[in-house]
């Protein structure tokens, strides 16, 4: 998904200046923006990354999401250790929320999403924190995207991986 040197294959929905590559990682720092992986869409898939979020920062890993302006329409695996939003890292935003801090700010962690049909699992550092069935199958297919939530948040992503599931 990411070659460690450029944003080839990625496209910001707005404010592309909020995204850079530094030390082999994708860094979000600046005004709100979402960086979409445009290479392929996916329905049943795995999506994972090593992530670090600043103190007070807010971000997310979107999957099965539509490209467009503003906040994407799709599922979001939250990335948030200490932002004022009480929904913390590992939450399936607005579907199944986690309110405890699983990872301190400025600490690398791995977030792993598995989406198969209506079943969604989110793991943080290999521990399952969400095991949810969306009976409505709200979002069945779409892009992957990374979130830069707001100025003052700094998020770093590396070792990004996606894999379609049979």
Question: What positions do the PLM features span?
Answer:
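Carbohydrate-interacting regions of secretory-pathway proteins
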Residues: 1-166
């Amino acid at each position: 998904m990411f070659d460690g040197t450029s944003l080839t294959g990625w496209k910001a929905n707005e404010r592309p200046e909020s995204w850079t590559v530094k030390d082999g990682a994708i860094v979000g720092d600046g005004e709100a923006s979402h960086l979409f992986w445009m290479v392929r869409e996916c329905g049943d898939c795995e999506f994972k990354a090593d992530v670090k979020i600043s103190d007070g920062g807010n971000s997310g890993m979107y999957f099965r999401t539509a490209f467009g302006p503003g906040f994407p329409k799709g599922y979001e695996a939250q990335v948030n250790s200490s932002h004022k939003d009480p929904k913390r890292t590992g939450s399936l935003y607005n579907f199944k929320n986690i309110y405890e801090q699983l990872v301190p700010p400025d600490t690398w962690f791995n977030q792993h999403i598995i989406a198969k049909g209506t079943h969604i699992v989110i793991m943080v550092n290999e521990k399952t924190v969400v095991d949810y069935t969306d009976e409505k199958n709200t979002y069945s297919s779409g892009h992957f995207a990374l979130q830069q939530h707001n100025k003052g948040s700094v998020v770093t992503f590396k070792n990004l991986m996606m894999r379609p599931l049979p």
